[in-house]
Amino acid sequence: MSTLSYVSPDALKGWLMESPNEISIIDVRDYDYEGERIPGSVRIPSDTFLASVDQHVDDLMKKRSLIVHCTYSQVRGPKAARVLSEILRNRITESKEKLSLSQKEKLFQNLPTVYILHGGFSAWKRRYGGQQGLIEYD
């Protein structure tokens, strides 16, 4: 399994401005979700992540980058990112189609890159809380 990388709030903002349709942001906050989120993010709470993420996998596989975060991205965000990365890889290895090793490798190379938001939503809010359009409210 590949090593997961972190992305800074500044880099994520750039991606959102340049190519918002190529990324998905997955918010795994639970009890600490207070109705504020990064624009366009999908909320899949960590306490139901394993049971819920599969319904999103087909859409997520169409993206270039997936960014996972919780409040601080210290425990839940990284854990969900590892699980998501494994689920995406398993989707290829468990494919019902008979694929050659080279075909599977090509599919692996085209999987979205899974990132963890450095500092989590807390860092995002601290950096962009006062800027129009960078936080959505329920």
Swiss-Prot record:
Changing residue 76 to A: No catalytic activity. One of its GO terms (molecular function) is protein tyrosine phosphatase activity. The active site is at residue 70. It holds the Pfam family Rhodanese. Its EC number is 3.1.3.48. It catalyses: O-phospho-L-tyrosyl-[protein] + H2O = L-tyrosyl-[protein] + phosphate. GO terms for cellular component: cytoplasm; cytosol; nucleus. The lineage of its organism: Eukaryota, Fungi, Dikarya, Ascomycota, Taphrinomycotina. Residues 19-133 form the Rhodanese domain. Belongs to the MPI phosphatase family. Disulfide bonds: none annotated. It is found in: Cytoplasm; Nucleus. One of its GO terms (biological process) is cell division. Keywords: Cell cycle, Cell division, Cytoplasm, Hydrolase, Mitosis, Nucleus, Protein phosphatase. May play a role in DNA replication checkpoint via regulation of hsk1 or may act downstream of hsk1 in an S phase regulatory pathway. This is Dual specificity phosphatase ibp1.
